[in-house]
Amino acid sequence: MIYGIGTDIVSIERIEHILNKNMQGLVNRILTDHEKALFANKGNSPAFCAKRFAAKEAFAKALGTGIGKVVSFLDLTVRNNEDGKPYFIPSEKLRLYLLEKGITKAHLSISDEKHNAVAFVILEVNQETN
């Protein structure tokens, strides 16, 4: 059963502008250590950063809380499986919150084109929970 749906779109140019002004500030605010290593390996790609930003915003929207008190950018790591499919790894604090809400699964789709990055998230709960 669907708990929530979230989507976010972000201008890659906007992220690039912020990275040019204050790369460390933005990177430290939105990327986990694992993501920082990937970001560096990808030549500090604005598209990489924009996709992670959009994914985390979409997750927070699906959760219904937005980024803030319940979930921060650093509470979520976006990884890819061996086939390239993206998925989330929540922090322990967020994992416990999701368990409390009965949320058992998060589906993530991320895409980018020349100017924009977009992410779509569906959160699921068990039928018995709701």
Regions found by a protein language model. Give the residues of each.
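Core catalytic alpha/beta fold that binds nucleotide/phospho-ligands
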Residues: 1-130
